[in-house]
Each structure stands twice: as structure tokens, then as C-alpha cells.
Regions:
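Active-site cofactor/cluster-binding pocket
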Residues: 17-20, 320-321, 336, 340-351, ...
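Peripheral docking tails and interdomain loops at the edges
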Residues: 336-432, 550
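Conserved thiamine diphosphate
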Residues: 136-186, 210, 359, 366-384
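Short acidic, glycine/serine/threonine-rich loops at helix termini
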Residues: 49-54, 83-86, 106-110, 131-137, ...
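Redox- and metal-dependent alpha/beta enzyme cores, enriched for Fe-S-associated oxidoreductases
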Residues: 280-308, 321-328
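Thiamine diphosphate
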Residues: 10-145, 150, 167, 392-393, ...
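Short helix-loop-beta junction
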Residues: 55-60, 298-312, 363, 461-468
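Conformationally flexible catalytic loops at phosphate/diphosphate-handling active centers
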Residues: 65-69, 180-275
Length: 550
């Protein structure tokens, strides 16, 4: 790499170009700009990240140091992780992309990479693990399976955050010498089209200190300057040696926050390890991470307008888990907390994030000198497994459960559990104020008929040629072609946080691209008052009414 002179603060604050892309492209963009070796193996929903990186290198696109990243496709995710491990030991800047079972195959190498304090970032489109059945859709089961590897873990909630956190994790890994899993929700974020601000090269360069690169190169294994690494240790030293990583993990939360602050100064987008939104005197707080936090923030904003004392806390840095920063972010008025996990750990007495929060607050109270004199009531819940919908009505049900005299702990929301009765009841027709200012559209098509591609182009045109914000999410099953696709599009003058589908009675525009759907689906049930319905049909204007189902 060629060292470059750091640009001035004024140059760094240059206007950022707005583009309309999905989460996978946002992560791949930063990864390609900040790495030299990219090991890939395809797995849904992370495959587009590797495909884009491969395409860009084939086109000769360069990273910020003027080199073209080398793309290596391996025989499996285990091979990709092994290649990353080898490349980083040789002093290269390296990354990979994966999800689900692919991440599980990387775990053996991840322990070594973390134990050797190697600055790698793995970008994960978080996806369900195969249990009673396989699912290609999103939850946090895979990243939670890797939480004990020693990798730091940074979560993104939106497409814009994917781009931003990809850069922040890359900088933090080099600065703090810990590898990162940067994860975001599979499909809900990885495949959502959204209008974002593109981070220009000068800001990426400003975030990556040349001294960190020189130090990383200096740790490369080379026969010219031999050192020993990766030995076999006996009981006399292994325990002591294992504890030597402690200072790096203790320092990492502060390092990440410092890099977030630097990023805010360059872009105007500010982040915290734990970001609170809500009433300053909130009594009920929901705590979670991932795309669901967007819908919770939208709902909290609505409830604040009705006088509710509620709030929400989104977790960004999950590992190392900083109890200090968590407690700083929580209002002192908090009395009831719902911790929502997007995973299930069978046999455990609670899901991972829930247990971390309970431990942090219990230790604070037990110290006698902490923020809370009495332990708030903390309830754990599961939501959104395999991309199950997480709507405003469900979020209100969680807040309602916090108010209940006989509150349900270790609950589920979003399903009807008639076996073990863990589920909360919710109102399916609940709406937020934010939805009233958004134009919502639905398009029904068949896989490979061009509907999804056309809608992506529509979103790009409106997002990039007007001042409006645009969001597109596309619902289809695991079949490659021929299945029904439903495109959910939203357009608004303000940022869109609705990380859930367009519901019945909400669509301002409905496009039916196959006449057979009229016999199969109640399409007009989705229409809002005064909605426009567009039918793609071979029938003439005179004959079309006779073709409609009676």
C-alpha cells in the first residue's frame, strides 16, 4: 500500500453523494475499499457481497491505497476462513462475507484469529440456523453461535448503518487489534433497497490511520524476521497466556466509541455503543439490536406523542459487552425493561442479550454504589426468527406486557404459541404516525418476470433523481424462479424506519402483473382509501371488466 497525506478537516467534510443501494452492497463497498485480499464462498443471503467484490475487482476498481483487491473463491466457508487467517498472518488486509451454516464453519479459525489478535472483519448477513428445518431467512442465531470466539461484534440496524459500521469496524479492528463480526439482518437489511449517503474515499482514508497499517505490516510473519506464533502450550503457561488478551478487550469499547466520534465529526452521523431514544423520564424501555430497532424507534416516537413514558435502547457493540456504557445510556427512571433477542437458545434460562443485560444491572445494584438502588423488572422475549414480521402492534404489545401486573417473562411475540403459551397478543391493525406521511406501494409478480428488477430501478430513479427517500423490500420464497413475488415500496420526504411489510388497508398503489392473481389473492384488501389499482392484462379496455372474477 502507498501511504497518503491525511486530508484537511474541510476536505473530509465534502458533500456526500446519495445513492440507492441495499445492505449487501453497502457492506461490500467499504470492504472492497479497505482490503487487499477477499476470500469468498456464496451463501444466501450474503452471496451478493462476494459477487459484487468479485465484479469490482474484475473491472479494475481500486481500494483507497491504489491496489486492486485480490478475490479468492474457496471450496467452502471453512476454506474462506482459513484463507483469511493465512492472509492476515502474512500482513495483508483481508475480509470475507458469510451467513448461517457458513459462519459455523468459520468458528474454528475464528478462535485462532481472535487469539492471535489479528485485525480481520467478517461481514455477516445474519440468518437462521438449520434446526427442525432449514431457513434462508434472517435472525441472529448464527452470530450468537459465534459470540464466544473472541471476535468483537458490531450490529447495524439499517442500510446506512451497514455502510457506516462496516468502516467503523474496519478502523476499530486495526486500531484495537481485535477481529470483528459486523452483522446486519439477513434479507430485512441485506436486501432492502434504501437511499443512503455514500462515504467518499477521502473520509475512508481519514478513518484508517497510516500508523495502524504500518504496525499491522510489522506483525506479519516473514522468514526474514522470524518469530514464534501458534505454539502448543502446557498447563504451566497456557492459563496465564490466555489472560494476556484482557487489556485489548477492556480497551475496545472506548476505542469503538472514539472512532464513532471521529466518524461523526467527518460525516455528521453520530453513533453510540448503546443509543437511547425516548422520554428522559421513561419508565418502560425496550432493548434490542438489528433492524427491529428501527420499527421500535418509530413506535416509541408515536407513543411519546400520546404522553407515554417509554424509550428504546439499541445495542451496537455487542462484544465486548460494556456494562458501563449500557448503564450510562439507560435513564435513571427506568423501572421496567424488555430485552428482545432475535434467536432461540433451547435449554437456556434466557437468550444471550437478555442474560447479559440482567447480569449488568444485577451487578450494578449489588455493588451498592451503582446507578440503580433497586433492580428494574427485566423481561426477556423472542421475536423475528426466520424474518418473522415485527410490527408496531407487536411492539405496543411488548410495552403493554411491561405494564401488566402479571407480566409474562420469556415471552414470544409475532406468533401464536398454542403449545407452550409463551406468545403475547397484539393488534394487527396498529399504525404509527410516521406511516401517515409515506406513500406505500405493492407490486405482485412471478419470480423472473422482471417485476422485482423493475421496482429496483424505480426506487433508484426516485431515490437518486428527487429529494425523496425510498425503501424497497421484496418478499419471495426459497424457489429460484416461478414463485410469487411481492414488492413493498415506500416513498417519503423524510427517512423511512418502517422495517416491516405494507399491511392490509395501507397500500396507496397496487400493481398486479399477472391476471391469475385475481383468482388467488384478495389484492384489494391491501388497498388504502382512494388507492390506485393497476392491472397488467392482455384484455382490451372494453373486455377487461368481463375478465375479472365474480
Amino acid at each position: 500500500f502507498a501511504l497518503r497525506t491525511r486530508p484537511s478537516a474541510r476536505e473530509e467534510m465534502s458533500a456526500q453523494k446519495k445513492v440507492t443501494i441495499d445492505g449487501n452492497q453497502a457492506a461490500a463497498y467499504v470492504a472492497h475499499k479497505t482490503n487487499e485480499v477477499i476470500a469468498i464462498y456464496p451463501i444466501t443471503p450474503a452471496s451478493p457481497m462476494g459477487e459484487l467484490a468479485d465484479e469490482w475487482s474484475a473491472e479494475g476498481r481500486k481500494n483507497i491505497w491504489g491496489g486492486i483487491p485480490e478475490i479468492i473463491e474457496l471450496q467452502s466457508e471453512a476454506g474462506a476462513a482459513g484463507s483469511v487467517h493465512g492472509a492476515v498472518q502474512a500482513g495483508a488486509l483481508t475480509t470475507t462475507f458469510t451467513a448461517s451454516q457458513g459462519l459455523l464453519l468459520m468458528i474454528p479459525n475464528m478462535y485462532k484469529i481472535a487469539g492471535e489478535l489479528s485485525p480481520v472483519v467478517i461481514h455477516v448477513a445474519a440468518r437462521s440456523l438449520a434446526a427442525q428445518a432449514l431457513s434462508i431467512f434472517g435472525d441472529h442465531g448464527d452470530v450468537m453461535a459465534a459470540r464466544s470466539t473472541g471476535f468483537a461484534m458490531l450490529a447495524s440496524c439499517s442500510v446506512q448503518e451497514v455502510m457506516d459500521m462496516a468502516l467503523i469496524s474496519q478502523a476499530a479492528a486495526l486500531r484495537g487489534r481485535l477481529p470483528f463480526v459486523h452483522f446486519f439482518d439477513g434479507f430485512r437489511t441485506s436486501h432492502e433497497m434504501s437511499k443512503v449517503e455514500l462515504i467518499p474515499d477521502e473520509i475512508i482514508e481519514a478513518m484508517i490511520d497510516n500508523e495502524w497499517l504500518v504496525a499491522h505490516r510489522g506483525r506479519a510473519l516473514t522468514p526474514d524476521e522470524p518469530v514464534i506464533r501458534g505454539t502448543s502450550q502446557n498447563p504451566d503457561v497456557y492459563f496465564q497466556a490466555r489472560e494476556t488478551v484482557n487489556p485489548y478487550y477492556s480497551a475496545m469499547p472506548g476505542i469503538v466509541q472514539g472512532i464513532m466520534d471521529q466518524f461523526a465529526g467527518l460525516t455528521g452521523r453520530a453513533y453510540r455503543l448503546f443509543d437511547y431514544f425516548g422520554a428522559v423520564d421513561a419508565e418502560r424501555v425496550i432493548l434490542l439490536m438489528g433492524s427491529g430497532a428501527e420499527a421500535v424507534e418509530e413506535t416509541v416516537e408515536h407513543l411519546l406523542g400520546t404522553g407515554e413514558k417509554v424509550g428504546m435502547l439499541r445495542v451496537r457493540l455487542y462484544r465486548p459487552f460494556s456494562a458501563v456504557h449500557l448503564l450510562q445510556a439507560l435513564p435513571a427512571s427506568t423501572r421496567h425493561i424488555a430485552v428482545l433477542d432475535r434467536c432461540k437458545e433451547p435449554g437456556a434460562d434466557g437468550e444471550p442479550l437478555y442474560k447479559d443485560v440482567v447480569t449488568a444491572l444485577a451487578e450494578d445494584v449489588a455493588s451498592g454504589e451503582g446507578k440503580f438502588k433497586h433492580l428494574p423488572r427485566i423481561l426477556g422475549g423472542r421475536y423475528g426468527l426466520s424474518s418473522k414480521e415485527f410490527t408496531p402492534g407487536m411492539i405496543r404489545a411488548v410495552f403493554g406486557n411491561l405494564s401488566a401486573g402479571q407480566a409474562k417473562n420469556k415471552f414470544t411475540v409475532g406468533i401464536h404459541d398454542d403449545l407452550t403459551h409463551t406468545s403475547l397478543e397484539w393488534h394487527a391493525d396498529a399504525r404509527n404516525l410516521a406511516q401517515e406521511h409515506v406513500k406505500q406501494c405493492l407490486f405482485y409478480g412471478l419470480g423472473s418476470d422482471g417485476t422485482v428488477s423493475a421496482n429496483k430501478n424505480t426506487i433508484k430513479i426516485i431515490g437518486e433523481e428527487t429529494d425523496n427517500y425510498a425503501q424497497g423490500y421484496f418478499v419471495y420464497d426459497s424457489k429460484k424462479a416461478g414463485a410469487v413475488t411481492v414488492s413493498h415500496l415506500r416513498f417519503s420526504a423524510s427517512p423511512i424506519r418502517s422495517t416491516y411489510l405494507v399491511n392490509a388497508g395501507e397500500a396507496d398503489f397496487i400493481g398486479c402483473h399477472q391476471t391469475v392473481f385475481l383468482d388467488r389473492f384478495e389484492l384489494l384488501d391491501m388497498a388504502a382509501p382512494n388507492a390506485v389499482f393497476l392491472l397488467n392484462t392482455p384484455a382490451s379496455v372494453e373486455d377487461v371488466w368481463d375478465t375479472l372474477p365474480r
